[in-house]
């Protein structure tokens, strides 16, 4: 997933972050349509309503995430975004373990914000918007998954999201006028759609339906650290010590919550 994000960051010089986000959404919708081929029932309003809201929530999460990435390092953005899953888990229980996890997450975010707040206020706010959208993604994704046709509904949801957010495609036009190869942009859109959206979100649907929250949380706990590693290797983004401690604190908060479930 975050390898795709690293590719997206390299595109920011040619295409706006919002345009890259739309390319990712549209690319994922196209790939999923070709592979999944939803049946007629998937397009009925009774199913399309929830699927569409889910797709739009996912699109909002991606757009806010990419806008934040344009202002903050990858590992930092992901760590801030993880407030969403932590909040969802904390809302479901009031144990001491949950309080400890929330405390660790707050400390982690405070450490990260202390590094970036002075110069990247908007980046922090956008990452927190992405966190709120991620919380919505988890709650809606669970409802979609338990209906038994999660991959089909994921596909139709992304089609709805790609259509509704299609005005963002206009932000790609300047890149084409500046001489960017259209076919290269299409290829990158498909690559982003597969690496960052179609595959990981389809796997989320399988996981949300088949495993418990504890195991899912353990897997999620690896992602802030993974994002920091990808940012370091692919983008040469070296985190400050305080920032690294904040990322580890957020990952630790998720592990603490996982141990109580």
Language model regions located:
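Glycine-/small-residue-enriched transmembrane alpha-helix faces in small-molecule transporters
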Residues: 1-22, 53-56, 60-64, 107-110, ...
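Transmembrane alpha-helices of multi-pass small-molecule transport proteins
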Residues: 14-60, 83-88, 133-137, 155-173, ...
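Juxtamembrane helix-entry segments on the extracytoplasmic side of multipass membrane proteins
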Residues: 14-22, 43-48, 114-136, 170-191, ...
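Specific alpha-helical transmembrane segments that line the substrate/conduction pathway
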Residues: 19-27, 58, 65-96, 130, ...
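Helix-helix packing/entry segments at the starts of transmembrane helices
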Residues: 23, 78-80, 140-162, 197-233
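Membrane-interface interhelical linkers
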Residues: 29-53, 94-100, 118-119, 148, ...
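Cytoplasmic-side transmembrane-helix entry/capping segments in multi-pass membrane proteins
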Residues: 46-55, 91-107, 123-128, 148-158, ...
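Hydrophobic transmembrane alpha-helices of multi-pass small-molecule transport proteins
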Residues: 83, 97-115, 132, 221, ...
């Amino acid at each position: 997933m975050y390898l795709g994000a690293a590719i997206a960051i390299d595109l920011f010089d040619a295409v706006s972050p919002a345009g890259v986000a739309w390319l990712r959404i549209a690319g994922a919708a196209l790939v999923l349509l070709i592979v999944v081929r939803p049946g007629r029932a998937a397009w009925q309003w009774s199913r399309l309503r929830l699927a569409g809201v889910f797709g739009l929530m996912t699109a909002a999460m991606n757009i806010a995430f990419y806008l934040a990435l344009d202002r903050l390092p990858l590992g930092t953005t992901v760590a801030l975004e993880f407030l969403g899953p932590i909040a969802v888990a904390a809302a479901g229980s009031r144990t001491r373990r949950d309080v400890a996890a929330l405390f660790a997450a707050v400390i982690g975010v405070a450490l990260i914000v202390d590094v970036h707040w002075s110069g990247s206020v908007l980046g922090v706010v956008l990452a927190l918007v992405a966190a709120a959208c991620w919380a919505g993604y988890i709650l809606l994704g669970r409802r979609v998954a338990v209906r038994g046709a999660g991959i089909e509904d994921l596909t139709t949801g992304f089609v709805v999201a790609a259509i509704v957010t299609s005005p963002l495609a206009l932000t790609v036009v300047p890149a084409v006028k500046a001489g960017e190869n259209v076919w290269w942009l299409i290829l990158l859109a498909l690559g982003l759609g597969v690496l960052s959206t179609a595959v990981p979100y389809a796997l989320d649907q399988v996981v949300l339906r088949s495993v418990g929250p504890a195991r899912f949380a353990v897997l999620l706990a690896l992602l802030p650290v993974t994002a920091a590693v990808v940012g370091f290797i692919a983008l040469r983004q070296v985190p400050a010590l305080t920032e690294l401690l904040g990322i580890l604190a957020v990952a630790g908060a998720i592990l603490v919550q996982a141990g109580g479930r």
